[in-house]
């Protein structure tokens, strides 16, 4: 048989690989015996070299294609070669020919020199040995997710999977810098395909293993922490004989054993610094005990996930993937177990030891050490595990549950110097417990509940079972050293974490795709609680304002996704305002549709059916559907369509048309819904949208019907009201009954009437917003036209005089909420405005806003000043100044209104207002004297107040952070010099997330300065992001928030922002968190 040159070449390669197989070292589980490894590599290299001179062959035939075409993996059974060579050949067809096999053979030489399993960047790209390849029955699919196929047409990055998005404990995970290439022709980033690990909701499979009980011993020392774990395990019904794979990142192994038999690395298991794989033939077929002892380093863990050190406190943060940085575990939310935890540490340094559940006992250890044992009788996923050790002081109280009269001990902990700031948190906890009992009928289920404040925390708080851990700014407050907003924040965050005890803990998630089931639902519960506790209309308006200015922007950006995403790379990147805030509105709509009585029935069904188990969004919808059937008295009624809210991205636009038949006294409302298609969802379906409406008599402003809720389930529908005596004004989406854009098609006169007389605060607020938006868009286009045409003089449409009179009417209304008045004198937030303007010129928008404020101020500044002075006595009353258990939210709203008015008057340079600013700076309330610093930016007293307020703030870290925010948002031309001053004199080398966010994020809201046409604002923030990414990827990604609006800006600014994002993507050690976020944001993933 005559062979072609190409065919001959294939069989030469085949012969070399046969040799490799013969020399395979079974004992060491190594591909080729070490003494022939270099020789084999030399054969390959010489063959490649000779081939490079083979002129008739080298241009037309690809070495890797030759091997690929042989398709050895179809008939070769040797698992090591199949996975480590042949699968890599298929995945690397386009790489240099010497790269593939040479790299795989030579890399093991270096690996053998590093057997201690400490953090090793060289391990990042290693394949896992001894595991099933492409087995569709693989039940450990959470860590073996397949990359996208090229046919999907989606760009991908290297090793971006669910587990590799954090730093290793001594540095940044080293990603292959070759993943991102610069294309000089269009300054874009080209990302090679077939590299990230994409996790899909549709690929969920139960684990092949069960963990029943977890016994942990955590021994804390100065330079290391030793963690010994015993897992009581079993084989699940889904097991198909696969390897036992544990998640474990950056762990140094002391010992691995099963049923007290030590396992041998390489022969019975492998560890690649990310996954511990125990080969299936060494896994027992029934119940067994898996034990491990590892060493970790919380003292150098600056990523603040897993176990880390905040000042002198050892603390954990395990959601979503932190537990794997403490010990080996099958780290997924449906792996629920009972925990028995013992913590030991130096008694002088760490006198307080805490973990989940009830404390069983405490004990002394020779050598000045001590320990405590904790038992949590409730099943929980590992992300709810927590441990704290430190020199902490506390306040405590006893709570008696409503139904069972059980005594619960409540403790709130902090550093000693901040104990006096714990009282409000303790009050909020008691209020939360009572609310959950009264509204939902849910009692606390342990005998003790601990809340702990720590200074270094990536997010707001964490709901760990029985041991809630808080960012200090979400637990500590005093009237002397905290801004007013701190009290509302603590109320909501303490409530949120407590409410998770049922919605998140006792009923947890089947998988991370269901995140909104615990977060959206719990935010909804938190909102109900805070609205009830504050009794102010502005509490609900603040939630609406957040959604419409932040989440709506995300929904129209390249980051748009449903509240339940269908795929993710890094789970931490999906803790978004969509999942949380839009998710909470989706959960709230059930209440709107069902009414309180039937909503509670549905909620009760959900808890009883799923208590102690995992759940999905379908489970919650099923429970609400049962209540819907009850309400409708119709067993055929269903909420199947409602599930589209969980799967469809984007914000619906709902528009209205009206018809009144005077003869029939019949009023018709025609409604249409439309959601814009996007790149991920080309087709959008009609949603189930509840529309709470009222009808207002235009002659006297009174209600003509009782409020009712319309159910829009089609693209268009018409709703008819009978016996309507006069043509009414519709009051639409009362209480913001659905998260949609409302196109009401009302006249300004009708909106003004609603603003003045409607009984619903949201409708009044929205009517005001719509009038503002009409004026903004009109004036913006006039300014833009003048700029583009270089006109020296031009006419601008004045603000409607009737609207200004309506604002005056409401300001002078003694019954109107002071916080509501703050909203109506303020233009909509920039991030809300941006949703209505394409190719935004930020300078033009700034000019537009200044013009409108001046138009209104010229007529109302005297009214503003009069109100500013008249409210002073009540707003700054000191009767309860020293009583931290008494908080008056109405009084706080008065201070908010006064500070808003002072800002408007300062911008307008109102006569003698500087004297008022100086006097205001003497107030004992921090919100007041920080406002005086902020508004002094318009005067030459700024640096005088800068120094004065710094001295007032510097000894309290949380108050200093509020001061930093105030300085950062200063509306001054020299803000860049001021930020540099903050960096050098205050921030310095701080790695504290609160400090970093405080210095930079407020600045990004400055229309003129951050969006300076030179691009220096974008460059500054990009440099901060890159620097932060080296030690804390999660915070680095949070700092990307201002880049979300890049595609809304004008062409020049789009280009500048895109250039900075591309520069960040080219960083050689960019984290997976940041890489995925930027790739999605720039439409590359």
UniProtKB/Swiss-Prot annotation:
Active site (UniProt): 497 (proton acceptor)
Residues annotated to bind Zn(2+): 496, 500, 519
Activity versus pH, per record: Optimum pH is 7-7.5. Active from pH 5 to 9. Has less than 20% of normal activity at pH 6.0.
Cell location: Cytoplasm
Highest taxon of the lineage: Eukaryota
Activity modulation: Inhibited by 1,10-phenanthroline, EDTA and bestatin. Inhibited by (Benzyl)Tyr-Ala (BTA). Activity is not affected by phosphoramidin, PMSF, leupeptin, iodoacetamide or pepstatin.
SUPFAM superfamilies documented for this protein: Leukotriene A4 hydrolase N-terminal domain, Metalloproteases ('zincins'), catalytic domain
Record text on subunit structure and interactions: Heterodimer of the p68 form and the p35 form which are derived from the p120 precursor.
Additional note from the record: May have an additional translation initiation. Translation initiation at the first Met codon would generate a form that contains the signal peptide, enters the endomembrane system, and ultimately reaches the food vacuole. Initiation of translation at an internal Met codon would result in a form that lacks the signal peptide, thereby re-directing the protein to the cytosol. A nuclear localization signal would then lead to nuclear import.
Function, as annotated: Displays aminopeptidase activity with a broad substrate specificity. Preferentially, cleaves after Leu and Met, but also cleaves after Ala and Arg. Low activity towards Lys, Phe, Tyr, Trp, Gln, Ser and Gly and negligible activity towards Glu, Asp, Pro, Ile, Thr, Val, His and Asn. Has dipeptidase activity. Plays a role in the terminal stages of host hemoglobin digestion by cleaving the N-terminal residue of small hemoglobin-derived oligopeptides.
PANTHER family xref list: PUROMYCIN-SENSITIVE AMINOPEPTIDASE
Membership in a protein family: Belongs to the peptidase M1 family.
Name of the protein this chain belongs to: Aminopeptidase N
Gene encoding the protein: M1AAP
């Amino acid at each position: 048989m005559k062979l072609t040159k190409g065919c001959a070449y294939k069989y030469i390669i085949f012969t070399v690989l046969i040799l490799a197989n013969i020399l395979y070292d079974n004992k060491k589980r190594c591909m080729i015996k070490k003494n022939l490894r270099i020789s084999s590599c030399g054969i390959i290299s010489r063959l490649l070299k000779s081939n490079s001179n083979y002129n008739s062959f080298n241009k037309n035939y690809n070495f890797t294609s030759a091997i690929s075409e042989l398709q050895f993996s179809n008939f070769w059974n040797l698992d090591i070669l199949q996975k480590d060579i042949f699968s890599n050949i298929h995945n690397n067809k386009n790489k240099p020919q010497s790269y593939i096999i040479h790299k795989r053979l030579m890399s093991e030489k270096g690996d053998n020199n590093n057997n201690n399993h400490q953090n090793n960047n060289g391990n990042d790209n290693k394949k896992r040995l001894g595991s099933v390849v492409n087995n569709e029955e693989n039940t450990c699919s959470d860590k073996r997710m397949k990359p996208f196929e090229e046919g999907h047409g989606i760009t991908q990055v290297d090793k971006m999977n669910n587990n590799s998005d954090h730093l290793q404990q001594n540095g940044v995970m080293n990603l292959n810098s070759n993943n991102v290439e610069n294309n000089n022709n269009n300054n874009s980033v080209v990302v090679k395909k077939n590299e990230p690990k994409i996790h899909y909701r549709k690929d969920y499979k139960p684990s092949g293993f069960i963990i029943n009980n977890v016994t942990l011993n955590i021994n804390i020392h100065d330079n290391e922490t030793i963690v010994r774990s015993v897992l009581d395990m079993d084989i699940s019904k889904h097991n198909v004989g696969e390897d036992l794979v544990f998640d474990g990142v950056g762990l140094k192994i002391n010992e691995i054993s099963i049923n007290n038999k030590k396992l041998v690395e390489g022969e019975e298991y492998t560890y690649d610094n990310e996954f511990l794989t125990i080969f299936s033939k060494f896994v027992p077929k029934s119940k067994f005990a898996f034990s491990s002892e590892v060493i970790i380093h919380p003292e150098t863990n600056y990523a603040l996930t897993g176990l880390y050190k905040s000042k002198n406190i050892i603390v954990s943060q395990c959601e979503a993937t932190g537990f794997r940085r403490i010990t080996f575990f099958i780290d997924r939310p449906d792996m629920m177990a009972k925990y028995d935890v013992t913590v030991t540490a130096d008694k002088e340094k760490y006198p307080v030891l805490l973990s989940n559940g009830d404390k069983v006992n405490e004990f002394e250890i020779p050598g000045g050490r001590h320990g405590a044992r904790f038992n949590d009788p409730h099943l929980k996923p590992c992300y709810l595990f927590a441990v704290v050790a430190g020199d902490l002081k506390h306040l405590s109280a006893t709570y008696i549950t409503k139904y069972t009269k059980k005594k619960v001990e409540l403790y709130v902990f902090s550093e000693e110097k901040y104990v006096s700031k714990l009282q409000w948190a303790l009050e909020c906890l008691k209020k939360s417990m009572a609310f959950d009992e009264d509204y939902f009928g849910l009692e606390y289920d342990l005998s003790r509940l601990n809340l702990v404040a720590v200074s270094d925390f990536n997010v707001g708080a964490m709901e760990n079972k029985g041991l809630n851990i808080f960012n200090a700014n979400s637990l500590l407050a005093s009237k002397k050293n905290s801004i007013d907003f701190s009290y509302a924040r603590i109320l909501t965050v303490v409530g949120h974490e407590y409410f998770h005890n049922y919605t998140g803990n006792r009923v947890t998630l089947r998988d991370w795709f269901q995140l909104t089931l615990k977060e959206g639902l719990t935010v909804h519960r938190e909102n109900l609680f805070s609205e009830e506790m504050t009794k102010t209309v502005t509490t609900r308006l603040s939630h609406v304002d957040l959604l419409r200015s932040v989440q709506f922007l995300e929904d129209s950006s390249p980051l748009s996704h449903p509240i339940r995403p269908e795929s993710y790379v890094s789970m931490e990147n999906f803790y978004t305002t969509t999942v949380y805030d839009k998710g909470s509105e989706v959960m709230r709509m059930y209440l709107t549709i069902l009414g309180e009585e039937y909503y509670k029935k549905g909620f009760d069904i959900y808890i009883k059916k799923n208590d102690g188990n995992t759940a999905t969004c379908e489970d919650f919808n099923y429970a609400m559907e049962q209540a819907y059937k009850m309400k409708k008295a119709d067993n055929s009624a269903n909420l199947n369509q409602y599930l589209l809210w969980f799967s469809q991205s984007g914000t619906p636009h709902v528009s209205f048309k009206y018809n009144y038949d005077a003869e029939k006294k019949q009023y018709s409302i025609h409604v249409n819904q439309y959601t814009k298609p996007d790149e991920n969802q080309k087709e959008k379906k009609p949603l189930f949208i509840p529309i709470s409406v009222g009808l207002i008599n235009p002659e006297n402003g009174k209600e003509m019907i009782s409020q009712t809720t319309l159910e829009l389930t089609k693209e268009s529908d018409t709703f008819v009201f009978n016996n309507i005596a006069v043509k009414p004004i519709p009051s639409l989406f009362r209480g913001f009954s659905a998260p949609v854009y409302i196109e009401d098609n009302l006249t300004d006169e009708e909106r003004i009437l609603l603003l003045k007389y409607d009984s619903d605060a949201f409708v009044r607020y929205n009517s005001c917003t719509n009038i503002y938006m009409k004026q903004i868009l009109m004036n913006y286009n006039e300014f833009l036209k003048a700029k583009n045409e270089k006109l020296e003089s031009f006419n601008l449409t004045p603000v409607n005089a009737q609207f200004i009179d309506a604002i005056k009417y409401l300001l002078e209304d003694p019954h109107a909420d002071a916080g509501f008045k703050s909203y109506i004198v303020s233009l909509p937030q920039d991030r809300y405005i941006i949703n209505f303007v394409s190719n935004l010129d930020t300078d033009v928008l700034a000019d537009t806003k200044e013009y409108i404020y001046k138009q209104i101020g010229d007529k109302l500044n005297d009214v503003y000043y009069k109100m500013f002075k008249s409210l002073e006595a009540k707003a700054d009353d000191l009767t309860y100044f020293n009583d931290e258990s008494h908080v008056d939210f109405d009084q706080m709203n008065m201070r908010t209104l006064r500070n808003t008015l002072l800002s408007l008057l300062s911008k307008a340079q109102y006569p003698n207002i500087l004297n008022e600013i100086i006097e205001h700076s003497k107030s004992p309330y921090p919100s007041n004297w920080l406002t005086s610093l902020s508004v002094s930016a318009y005067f030459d007293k700024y640096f005088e107040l800068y120094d004065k307020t710094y001295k007032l703030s510097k000894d309290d870290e949380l108050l200093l952070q509020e001061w930093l925010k105030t300085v950062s948002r200063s509306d001054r031309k020299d803000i860049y010099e001021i930020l540099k001053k903050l960096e050098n004199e205050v921030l310095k080398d701080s790695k504290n997330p609160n400090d970093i966010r405080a210095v930079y994020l407020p600045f990004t809201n400055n229309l003129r300065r951050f969006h300076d046409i030179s691009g220096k604002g974008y460059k500054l923030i990009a440099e901060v992001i890159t620097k932060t990414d080296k030690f804390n990827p999660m915070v680095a990604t949070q700092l990307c928030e201002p880049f979300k609006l890049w595609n809304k800006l004008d062409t020049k600014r789009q280009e500048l922002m895109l250039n900075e994002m591309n520069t960040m993507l080219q960083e050689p050690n960019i984290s997976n968190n940041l890489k995925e976020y930027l790739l999605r944001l720039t439409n590359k993933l």
